Amino acid sequence: MPEVSTDDLDERQVQLMAEMCILVDENDRRIGAETKKNCHLNENIERGLLHRAFSVFLFNTENKLLLQQRSDAKITFPGCFTNTCCSHPLSNPSELEENDAIGVRRAAQRRLKAELGIPMEEVPPEEINYLTRIHYKAQSDSIWGEHEIDYILLVKKNVTLNPDPNEIKSYCYVTKEELEELIGKAAHGEIKITPWFQIIADTFLFKWWDNLNRLNLFVDHEKIHRM
């Protein structure tokens, strides 16, 4: 694996780069494990390194979507606006368990607490709805990027928030119209949004949003959408 200096990066975020992500093939079959750092180096991504991830979309009971702005300390896509929570299940027994994506949903519960301070009892895995998966690749800069099989998870619930400033610069609940305005600002270069959030907003998000009480219509655990 290539050696890249992390001396100028945020110390806490560098520590997280030692976490072990789950390596998968293009059909999401587990083939091993690798550090978060190595999974996010463009040099490895160009060789085909692919890992498992998830994206949470949390709506409150007013049907507003919780967005976050990633902190400037983040190594990939710092300062970008994105969906509620985006991270990775780890290569450990609890989060490797694949039946009904329970391992991924446990990882989502863990990261909702770590990033947004949401008490774990407020988002039990059984209330995190697994819809489908997308496969995408994106560069953050010349060194870092993403190449993921991304599990799409939806939650509809009012939650308690206490964000970690090392993870999150700001957050807000938005209506559909407010999100469209935000996407417009990104198109004009006024703000930045993450590529996976842009992809999902351009394809599926508004259809899901219109049917939050009928999400079963959109459950597809067989297909991996190639983006």
Curated annotation (Swiss-Prot):
Cofactor: Mg(2+)
Record has Hydrolase as a keyword: no
Catalytic activity: isopentenyl diphosphate = dimethylallyl diphosphate
Domain of life of the organism encoding this protein: Eukaryota
Annotated substrate binding sites: 36, 70, 74, 87
Alphabetized InterPro entries for the sequence: IsopentenylPP_isomerase_typ1, NUDIX_hydrolase-like_dom_sf, NUDIX_hydrolase_dom
Subcellular localization: Peroxisome
Annotated GO MF terms: isopentenyl-diphosphate delta-isomerase activity; metal ion binding
Name of the protein: Isopentenyl-diphosphate Delta-isomerase 1
Species of origin: Bos taurus
